[in-house]
């Protein structure tokens, strides 16, 4: 046992990164539990196009596991991957249902976008973009992701609800899910203040146990057999994806993945302290997992795979190496057989005729958003040519409900303000701003 422990330590550089095996396992478990909703949401969304629910669920778990394994073993970062939220709705409701394109052809477009991302990664284009982002924008991105996931936590916990007049309003503080969300915030906050190891995981476990007698968590067994992936396996229509009318669809898949992943890498890396002089070590390796997993995922039967912002929950739990990502990969594979347990914690609670809420995981997202807000202190608020782009990035992510769109606000205003102030801007950053503008002018929403 001891030699194996040393080999794991050397491979993942655990001691060098100030962590250990138990910490990494806890971090992986927390990350998985906060991201496990995708196991059930993804097939629910894609099945609207006629795709088989069970096959998509299996493809989702396998593509997520593949991406996490590559991230952990190749890049050695504690970042989880899975099919992305947002882009899956674009796949289902805009491309397939809205444009009348078959889901097979849409998968072909995802497959082609994955190949393009692999090429861009190997040519180091993606790493170049990441390392050229100024430090103040990196801080704005990290804080913006924190605010974004905190807002998601507020929504999933029922603390804020839709309101036609004011967009959002305070939720019903007397409802049981909201009370549980607030209780979870206090519980995890106290555990963190007392510096209890595994505070976030302990909080989630206690909330789950407390939720059982109140009906917020439903025990549905322990083991289930994985669904057959046959109905979607290798069903993508690559030839159809080369149709002239689908070029914009492929480009949207590429664009969203490119900047969503870049934003997540920046945010999580800032939080974990990975950045060295404004650059991310092993950036090219960190960009390969989502590209490969997207390509493989399309072949299996699911939409674009991205780096998950929920990875920040694992970092908050102490995860600092790829071992965290490997643990997440193993859990996604186990979820094929233990989906009832994953659904018990991450599947949410749906009251009669109501919206599904997630009172177990929502407090975790809000807590992590609080932790990531510390990046705002790194911005020089006295320099308007830096403060305004960072601020627009920060507030843009939750208000547009998109990491990529929030980044666009900052990336477009940054070179404009700098140039108008008589300062120089790297040509690549100007090109990115132009591409963002063209993306909205030519490709639409």
Predicted regions located by residue number:
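Helix-loop-helix hairpins and the membrane-proximal interhelical loops
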Residues: 1-55, 168-171, 201-284, 437-438
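Helix-loop-helix junctions within the multi-pass membrane cores of secondary transporters/permeases
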Residues: 3-42, 63, 84-93, 97-142, ...
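Residue-level signature of catalytic and energy-coupling elements of molecular machines
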Residues: 25, 45, 129, 198, ...
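Hydrophobic/aromatic residues within the transmembrane alpha-helices of Major Facilitator Superfamily
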Residues: 29-36, 66-69, 73, 150, ...
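Loop-to-helix transition at the N-terminal end of transmembrane alpha-helices
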Residues: 50-69
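Juxtamembrane transmembrane-helix boundary signature
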Residues: 64-85
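Membrane-embedded alpha-helical modules
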Residues: 99-213, 326-445
